Amino acid sequence: MASIALWANKNGCDKLNFTYKTYSAEDTIALGREIGRRLHGGEVIAYRGGLGAGKTTITRGISEGMGLGDEVTSPTFALVNEYRKKDCPISLIHFDMYRITSGQDLETTGFFDYMDDDAVLAVEWSENIDEDLPEDCIKITINRLSDDEREIVIETCDGDVRFENIGN
């Protein structure tokens, strides 16, 4: 079941929040799959959530929904993983910003170069690069409620309702 809240931030950008609850990793992947089906390229997804919250799990579902398959792994040590497929017009670039502490560190990941691409950028530990994220990025916060349960909040900007009623 989803709950929806509308509010305006200090910059005047209307934000929409869509809240979902998942009860297993499979549910989280299924939610990600539905998110992936609604992406068209050029989006930046900014994840928030602690270790083991499910950021890579939901990214696996997003990749499936985009038609890129489920071979998604955490980019913790590589910092960035690219998922491309010859017959898929959109690619997925998956970042882990856990160890990024400066603009110089961020520059070495190629983040800004990828933003010029029509790819979807999925950014774990996005709070480490808040000031460099586009204002219209899609924010996904994953709250771990138990070993299996997650509360997942999707925040969009300027009336973007693509993620309303997922799974209903």
Give the location of each predicted region.
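Conserved lysine of the Walker
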Residues: K55
